[in-house]
Amino acid sequence: MVLDDLGTSLRSSLDKLQGKSRLSESDVEEIVKEIQRSLLSADVDVSLVMELSDSIKTRALEEEPPGGTTAKDHVLKIVYEEMVELVGDSTELPLENQTILLAGLQGSGKTTSAAKMAWWFSKKGLRPAVIQTDTFRPGAYDQAKQMCERAEVDFYGDPDNDDPVAIAREGLEATADADVHIVDTAGRHALEDDLIAEIEEIERAVDPDRSLLVLDAAIGQGAKEQARQFEKSIGIEGVMITKLDGTAKGGGALTAVNETDSSIAFLGTGETVQDIERFEPSGFISRLLGMGDLKQLSERVERAMAEAQEEDEDWDPEDMLQGEFTLKDMKRQMDAMNRMGPLDQVMDMIPGMGGGMMDQLPDDAMDVTQDRMRRFERIMDSMTDEELEQPRVVGQSRTERIARGSGTDEETVRQLLEQHSMMEQTISQFQGMGEGDMQRMMKKMGGGEGGGLGDMMGGGKGPF
C-alpha cells in the first residue's frame, strides 16, 4: 500500500527506542531526524515536515511520560497524535441530497473515483447518479458507463454532444430522482487555461454542494500547485487520494490537503468499484504506525459476509459454531475473505498483525499466500458435493482425480485437507465458549498457534 515505505521507516525509527525507560535530548534529536528523513522521502512538503518534527521534538522533551510507559510508547503516542493533526479531519459528507463536482488532471482517476463514490453512497442507502461530462478524452464515456454498470448505479452521458456544460445540465434533469449527483469532469495533462475555464463553467451550471479534488497518490510535489489552482478556480472542500494500492510515496497528496486548507474525503485502494474507503484519520495513521484499524476491519468483514450471504442465502456463518465445519464452509470463508480486499491491506488493519510483523515477512509473502488460496479454491471447485460435505471420503484415487481436474498436484490437495482439519479443530474449540474464552482463543490464534492468523503468515502449517 502507498506510504508503506513511510510506515516502515517510522516504525524502524521508533524501534531504536526499544528498552529505554527515559529519553535523553540526543535520543529525541536522533528520532526527529529519522522522522524528517522518512517524511521527506515520502514527498511531504518541507515546511510541513519541519512543522511536524518541531512539534514532536517539543512534546517529547517537555511532556512527562505517564507512569509505566516506555520511551517508545510515549514517542509513538506523540507521533500518532501529531500525524493525525497533520492529515486533519475527514471531509464532511452528510448522507443526504447533494451534488459533488470532481476535479483533477487527466490520469488522476476521476472517472473510476466517480463510480466508486457512487457505489459507496449506494451502500449507505442512497440513490446516486454519475454524470459524465468529459468530452475531451476518447473512451471516457464508455469507461464511465462500464464502471457505473459494475457499481449498479445510475449513469448519464451523451457521446454525441461535445458541450460539457450542456451535458451537465441535461444530466441533472435526466437523473432528477437521484439523491446524490456526482459530476465527473475532463482533465488535461497539465493545468491549462481551457481546463480551468471549462470546469468553472460546469461549476456555475451545476452549483455543487462540494467540490472534491482527485489526486493520484504518486503526484509528488506537483500536488501543491495543482491544488492551489483548483482551489482558486472552484474552491476545494475535500480530496480523494487514488491508487493507494500502488508503491507511490503519497506525501504530495498530504501536502495538497494542507495547501487547500481542506481535508481527505476518500481513499482509493484498488481497481474495482468496491476498493474505496471513507477516510478516517485516526485509523489511517494507526495502520501506518502498525497499530491496526479495527473499525475499518469490522466494516469490511460485515460487508464481505453480507455479500457472501446474498449469493448463498442458505449459508449462515454462525452455523459453523454449531455443527460440522465442512469444506463448503471453508470455501465460503475464503470467498468472504477475498471480498475484503488485498490480503496485505486486511493484515494492516489487525492490531499486532500489520506494521512490524509485516516488515519481517518476505516481500512476496502476501502474493504467495493469495496464490495458495486460489489453488485451494480450484481444488474445491473440482470436488463433488459429497467430498465437500465429507472430506474424509477423499482417498488416494479421489485425490488423484481432484488434482488432475484442478490442474494442481496431489500434495496440494493433501495440504488443503490438512488445512481443513486444522481449522475444523480450532473452530470446534470455540463451540460452547463464553466471550472471555473466545478472546483468549483469538489471542492464541493471532500468535500462530492452532491454525490462526499468525500461521497464515508463515508461523506454522497455517491457513493457506
UniProtKB/Swiss-Prot annotation:
Name the positions where GTP binds. 104-111, 184-188, 242-245
InterPro entries noted in UniProt: AAA+_ATPase, P-loop_NTPase, Signal_recog_part_SRP54_M_sf, Signal_recog_particl_SRP54_hlx, Signal_recog_particle_SRP54_M, SRP/SRP_N, SRP54, SRP54_GTPase_dom
According to the UniProt entry, what is the EC number of this protein? 3.6.5.4
Write down the Pfam families for this protein, in alphabetical order: SRP54, SRP54_N, SRP_SPB
Question: Coiled-coil segments, which residues?
Answer: none
Please classify the protein's predominant subcellular localization into one broad category.
cytoplasm
UniProt-recorded Gene Ontology molecular function terms? 7S RNA binding; ATP hydrolysis activity; GTP binding; GTPase activity
Q: Enumerate the subcellular locations listed in this protein's record, separating them with semicolons.
A: Cytoplasm
Q: Which UniProt keywords apply?
A: Cytoplasm, GTP-binding, Hydrolase, Nucleotide-binding, Ribonucleoprotein, RNA-binding, Signal recognition particle
Q: Which GO terms describe its biological process?
A: SRP-dependent cotranslational protein targeting to membrane
Asked whether the UniProt record includes Nucleotide-binding among its keywords, one would answer yes
Q: What is known of its domains?
A: Composed of three domains: the N-terminal N domain, which is responsible for interactions with the ribosome, the central G domain, which binds GTP, and the C-terminal M domain, which binds the RNA and the signal sequence of the RNC.
HAMAP family, per this entry?
SRP54
General function of this protein: Involved in targeting and insertion of nascent membrane proteins into the cytoplasmic membrane. Binds to the hydrophobic signal sequence of the ribosome-nascent chain (RNC) as it emerges from the ribosomes. The SRP-RNC complex is then targeted to the cytoplasmic membrane where it interacts with the SRP receptor FtsY.
Complex and partners: Part of the signal recognition particle protein translocation system, which is composed of SRP and FtsY. Archaeal SRP consists of a 7S RNA molecule of 300 nucleotides and two protein subunits: SRP54 and SRP19.
Q: What is this protein called?
A: Signal recognition particle 54 kDa protein
**Gene transcribed to yield this protein:** srp54
